Swiss-Prot record:
With S4 and S5 plays an important role in translational accuracy. Belongs to the universal ribosomal protein uS12 family. Residues 9-18 have a biased composition (Basic residues). The keyword Chloroplast does not apply. GO terms for molecular function: rRNA binding; structural constituent of ribosome; tRNA binding. GO terms for biological process: translation. GO terms for cellular component: ribosome; small ribosomal subunit. InterPro entries: NA-bd_OB-fold (IPR012340), Ribosomal_uS12 (IPR006032), Ribosomal_uS12_bac (IPR005679). The lineage of its organism: Bacteria, Bacillati, Bacillota, Bacilli, Bacillales. It holds the Pfam family Ribosom_S12_S23. This is Small ribosomal subunit protein uS12. The gene is rpsL. It comes from the Bacteria. Residues 1-26 are annotated as: Disordered.
Length: 137
């Protein structure tokens, strides 16, 4: 336990909070061709690869993912939520933060119903999260 005098001389250091989605915290200065610190809630990107991967140990499935080159030049792996999708190479997508716990290295989600990504078909509940329009009566 430090004394008051020790704390006056050298105060406690505050913890540095590390971002869970670092690619959303960078913007591209196209004049200087360098990354700048600009926080954004979502970013646009182009799919460079679409595929499936298997989750970590206790779980078993084929999870859909896309490798996305963002508008700031960073390439990330993003999860495609919902049942079925229409994404392929060169599709323009919107990504948001949010990791997938059982897929290592996947720190982003693709926003369904935005840009080239279609919403989930015949979805009744939680429609806003999957970009599905309200069904006609």
């Amino acid at each position: 336990m430090p004394t008051i005098n020790q704390l006056v001389r050298k105060p406690r250091q505050s913890k540095i909070k590390k971002s869970t989605s670092p690619a959303l915290n960078k913007g591209l200065n196209s004049f200087k061709r360098e990354l700048t610190d600009v926080n954004s809630p979502q970013k646009r990107g182009v799919c460079t690869r679409v595929g499936t991967m298997t989750p970590k140990k206790p779980n078993s499935a084929l999870r859909k993912y896309a490798r996305v080159r963002l508008s700031n030049g960073i390439e990330v792996t993003a999860y495609i939520p919902g049942i079925g999708h229409n994404l392929q190479e060169h599709s323009v997508v919107l990504i948001r933060g949010g990791r997938v716990k059982d897929l290592p290295g996947v720190r982003y989600h693709i926003v369904r119903g935005a840009l080239d990504t279609a919403g989930v078909e015949n979805r009744g509940q939680s429609r806003s999260k999957y970009g599905t329009k309200k069904p006609k009566k």
